[in-house]
Amino acid sequence: MSIEVISSGLQTTVQDLGRIGWRHMGVPESGAADKSSMKLANQLLKKKINSPVLECTLTGPILKFLKPLSFVITGASMESKINNTYIKNNTPYAVKKNDVLSLSNCSTGCRSYIAFSEEIISNSFLDSHSTYLPANLGGINGLPLQEGSIVKTQPNKLSSSSEGNIGIERINSYKNEWKIRVIAGPEFVLLTDESQEVVFSSVYLVSNDTSRMGTKIEGVNLEFHNKHHMLSSPVHTGTIQCPENGLPIILGCDSQTLGGYPRVLQIAEIDYPSIGQLRPNDKISFIKTSIEEASRQLEDIA
């Protein structure tokens, strides 16, 4: 036994970098919603960047350590304490047996990540330990952490030095207003000329209907030249669909692999981590970019 769950938080799941290369079989990628923060947590503990971590949403868990361990918290800043002592994000801490870690609410951002010095023992499916709740895949029995349950850990079989860029620009950079870079999607041309301009000049509001699968946003309704009927087509994390009501939907890491709504925009990969940190009432502005510019910006931080 390693860690006892005293309180589970709103939704705390085991995540890694996800199931890469299975979307053609209808299996979402899943993985951490903010992969930059997840990688950073592992790098700060000098672990492999794909090691499973705990992803905490809006409200974090209360965990009792049943053995000495080290841990670090990254991502959204929740009010965090070891016993009665406040601690900081992005700083590794060592705890003793019976110490209690508690995470409360975050004021900006949506998701925090907890990495441990030992490996979380969890179920693997298609080479990933990520929890996919709609099908109860991966993680700990395919479920969020449950009050009274035990998170088991084991010593690392392999140690690893830090891999890649830790994304310093993202540390503590969460806010309530987001500028998100996008590329015109395959069906962007179906929008009226006015809507093609409005989508880049308007500020959208994140609705309460947001999850790892997708985020509905509110604002100016987009309009199409004509009523359209299209076959279901491939979609991906960051695809922005627009249903008949004209209000866009941002697809997340647990989104379906096919969709029948027009794909008007595609978020640039460099801003995928922002999708995972959106919370209700946040403001979003879309910034138009090109495939070439988005690729260059991604290479600059690689």
Regions inferred by a protein language model and the residue ranges of each:
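Conserved "landmark" site that anchors the functional core of diverse proteins
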Residues: 1-302
